[in-house]
Amino acid sequence: MELLRLLAVAAVAAMAAEVAAGGDSGWSSGSATFYGGSDASGTMGGACGYGNLYSAGYGTSTAALSTALFNNGQSCGACFEVRCGGGGSCLAGTVAVTATNLCPPNYALAGDAGGWCNPPRPHFDMAEPAFTRIAQARAGVVPVQYRRVACAKQGGIRFTITGHSYFNLVLVTNVGGAGDVTAVSVKGSRSGWQAMSHNWGANWQNGANLDGQPLSFRVTASDGRTVTSDNVAPSGWSFGQTFSGGQF
């Protein structure tokens, strides 16, 4: 009985500590700036290859990640919850952003004096509308806390096929769940599953001739979950088209 009482006391103490901390587990420290203008029009394109972020479904809640976070494009599509880490310019609350770009290092400047994206600094260069939800724009740069969160997306994963015969380049966008993709496979009606290799950003490539075949795609996210989208592209697909599949 005494052991049960002690365990109960310990459990209550742990819950009290959790409440006192606001349930704040999993946060890391970094910094944030902003770019792209008040309408985020300057954030279009970028190192993930998403192009027009409005039509691609990412909107203005986006961020360019420093090299330490970008992971050579493997972090494209990952979602982060960010909050201001202190100072008079901070605003209450958090904002969720999707990684859509790289914030390149500037080795001509010190990491704490303009070289915000220099390794090994974890930094978010956020679209201005996202930044101004957690801090006043006049701050320029603020310390932040961040953590990975699930991505909430509408509709299915999108596959945009470009390239040419024997070089299929597929841009994978609108990925829910973990958001960032670690593996993609493609299957034609006359072939088995073939692994695609990471090309750049959110683009994956394959060297098979898949012309004239219905195409299926299998996407694996960083959390290990996999979604298979069967026959999303009909046999008459052509390069430049986008097709929607399943979702996490």
From Swiss-Prot:
Annotated ranges, domain Expansin-like CBD: 166-245
Keyword presence, Membrane: yes
From the Swiss-Prot or TrEMBL record, state where the protein is found. Answer: Secreted, Cell wall; Membrane
A GO CC term assigned to this protein in UniProt: extracellular region
Tissue spec. comment: Expressed in roots.
SMART domains noted in UniProt: DPBB_1
User: In the UniProt record, does the keyword Secreted occur?
Assistant: yes
Boundaries of every Expansin-like EG45 domain copy = 45-156
Q: How is the protein disposed in the membrane?
A: Peripheral membrane protein
Q: Which CDD domains does the protein's record reference? A: DPBB_EXPA_N (cd22274)
User: Per UniProt, which keywords does this protein have?
Assistant: Cell wall, Cell wall biogenesis/degradation, Membrane, Secreted, Signal
Task: Tell me the Gene Ontology biological-process terms attached to this UniProt entry.
Answer: plant-type cell wall loosening
- Secretion signal: which residues? 1-22
Query: By its UniProt entry, which Pfam families does this protein fall under?
Result: DPBB_1, Expansin_C
Q: What does this protein do?
A: May cause loosening and extension of plant cell walls by disrupting non-covalent bonding between cellulose microfibrils and matrix glucans. No enzymatic activity has been found. May be required for rapid internodal elongation in deepwater rice during submergence.
Give the family per the record: Belongs to the expansin family. Expansin A subfamily.
Which PANTHER family does the protein's record reference?
EXPANSIN-A15
Protein's name in the database: Expansin-A11
Origin organism is: Oryza sativa subsp. japonica
Q: What is the lineage of its organism?
A: Eukaryota, Viridiplantae, Streptophyta, Embryophyta, Tracheophyta
